[in-house]
Amino acid sequence: MQLADLSNLAAKLDGVTERRRDGLLDWRYRGRRVARQLDGSHIVIRSSFDSRDFLVRSFPETFSVPRRFAKHMMIVADLENGNAEAIEDAVIGAWELQSGK
């Protein structure tokens, strides 16, 4: 999965805006973070704790929770080596979480 794929997905999610902050992409729903770019191959995605645990167990090659995100409702996705469908589903889940859909 590429960052351009995420931009295309975000454009299809009602109310999600994309912008750059310090050169990195950031996607928000009414000001609430859905996901943001960490570097060229990783993004962090908003996620409930239950969903985060499920994703890490189900797709360990795709998702991780570094220590700095352990107390936060966030999960890191590996765009280069991860499962593109799982990442897409996680981003849609983040939008649903933030939008209440």
Residue ranges of each PLM-predicted region?
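Charge-dense, helix-prone N-terminal extensions
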Residues: 1-101
